[in-house]
Amino acid sequence: MVVKVGIAKLGNIASGVMGELLLDERADREDMITFMATSGTKLQPEDIERVVSNMKAWGPDFCIVVSPNGVLPGPTQAREDLAAAGIPCIVITDDVTTKKEQFEALKASNFGYIIMKADAMIGARREFLDPIEMADYNGNLVKVLALTGAFRKMQMELDKVIDQVKAGKKGADLALPKVVMTSDKAVDGEFSNPYALAKARAAYEIAQSVAGVNVKGCFMTKEWEKYIPIVASAHEMMRQAMLLCEEARTLEKGVDAVIRKPHKKTGEIVSKTALISKPE
């Protein structure tokens, strides 16, 4: 069978940039297809309704609802509307664990979730953030999530759900992920060199802390002379996290130990480390 995977992208976080691409990296899988509906950059009710209506019309076996601050009313309503239509949902969002009441409600619900703690909010001040700065920040963040192992763990969790659908499960019978992507979880099993692991773990910890700095610069500081250097420093932190990730991967390359786990056309995941070798 061919599994239908929906991606409802509401606003933007770095995890949403790569969502469906991580499941079909060479666009040659024959066991699943994806459909993305996006609200664009905004989270207005009419934008979200457009996404939900298009997703309902397509009728996926399950839907990934990816957004910043996934406990906001808009994303919450979107997944509830999809669930009411019989579509199982997995929430992918940035760190909402500090929002105790809403996060407890999410944990107690039937929704799956993957909380990407390092997918930190951007320094969205007009005096600092132009289109190029925005793209540069997201590029650095994507690299952090990729090279620490966070993206692989996210992809593996989603592939588990695809495998369940292929095995005949559907609807409420699907076991959906409930994962908080900490630094330890991200780097687990990704590195043979302990120094590479330490660098990647440091990168993830730095990226996690960027959100707090940007919250201070975007919401807690009123004087522009003060908030500009605050958000600029947050972006410099993300750049340093990215550089640590590159150093970690270079160390792994030096001992020919970079882990690669491609999909076969059937969806089976194979693995290799030595560069000049075939995945098995």
Curated annotation (Swiss-Prot):
Annotated catalysed reactions: 5,10-methylenetetrahydromethanopterin + oxidized coenzyme F420-(gamma-L-Glu)(n) + 2 H(+) = 5,10-methenyl-5,6,7,8-tetrahydromethanopterin + reduced coenzyme F420-(gamma-L-Glu)(n)
GO function terms (MF aspect): ferredoxin hydrogenase activity; methylenetetrahydromethanopterin dehydrogenase activity
Pathway noted in the entry: One-carbon metabolism; methanogenesis from CO(2); 5,10-methylene-5,6,7,8-tetrahydromethanopterin from 5,10-methenyl-5,6,7,8-tetrahydromethanopterin (coenzyme F420 route): step 1/1
Top-level lineage group: Archaea
Pfam family, one: MTD
Keywords, comma-separated and alphabetical: Methanogenesis, One-carbon metabolism, Oxidoreductase
Keyword Oxidoreductase on entry: yes
Presence of keyword Oxidoreductase: yes
Listed GO biological process terms: methanogenesis, from carbon dioxide; one-carbon metabolic process
EC number: 1.5.98.1
Task performed by this protein: Catalyzes the reversible reduction of methenyl-H(4)MPT(+) to methylene-H(4)MPT.
HAMAP family: MTD
Cited NCBIfam families: PRK00994.1
Family, similarity comment: Belongs to the MTD family.
Name the record gives this protein: F420-dependent methylenetetrahydromethanopterin dehydrogenase
Annotated source species: Methanoculleus marisnigri (strain ATCC 35101 / DSM 1498 / JR1)
Gene: mtd
